[in-house]
Amino acid sequence: MRAIITFALFCVLYVTVQGKTSSPKVQVYSHFPGEYGKENTLICHVSGFHPPDITIELLKDGEILPNTQQTDLAFEKGWQFHLTKSVTFKPERGQNYACSVRHMNNKNIYSWEPNM
């Protein structure tokens, strides 16, 4: 009987957790202040999302940047997840750098603001 109650509680918890959808919060920034022609790291940190069905791409003028690195998917309290993707780059004047995030059926693009 105890096993049945435990299983039932597990099922209720599973359904409750699976039923909550949270949109991602996205931050796009660089490791150092942006300076044209100087090597830097472009970072896209995505947090607070559920379920963990997500794709992150770093872009230069709409094209996917190669040689990116991605952290392992991790979760926070409340079963919300976070993930970070980064790449080494040299900002060029007139180029647009961005992070594309697809979560579930929603896709958004977030631009990097170099503050130069």
UniProtKB/Swiss-Prot annotation:
Leader sequence segment: 1-19
Name of the protein this chain belongs to: Beta-2-microglobulin
Intrachain S-S bonds: 44-99
Gene Ontology CC annotation, any one: extracellular region
Compartments (UniProt record): Secreted
Pfam families from the UniProt entry: C1-set
Domain of life: Eukaryota
Sequence ranges assigned to domain Ig-like C1-type in this UniProt record: 24-110
Quaternary structure note: Heterodimer of an alpha chain and a beta chain. Beta-2-microglobulin is the beta-chain of major histocompatibility complex class I molecules.
Function: Component of the class I major histocompatibility complex (MHC). Involved in the presentation of peptide antigens to the immune system.
Main location: secreted
Family: Belongs to the beta-2-microglobulin family.
GO biological process, one term: antigen processing and presentation of peptide antigen via MHC class I
SUPFAM superfamilies: Immunoglobulin
Keywords for this protein: Disulfide bond, Immunity, Immunoglobulin domain, MHC I, Secreted, Signal
Source organism: Cyprinus carpio (Common carp)
Keyword presence, Lipid biosynthesis: no
InterPro entries associated with the record: Ig-like_dom, Ig-like_dom_sf, Ig-like_fold, Ig/MHC_CS, Ig_C1-set, MHC/Immunoglobulin
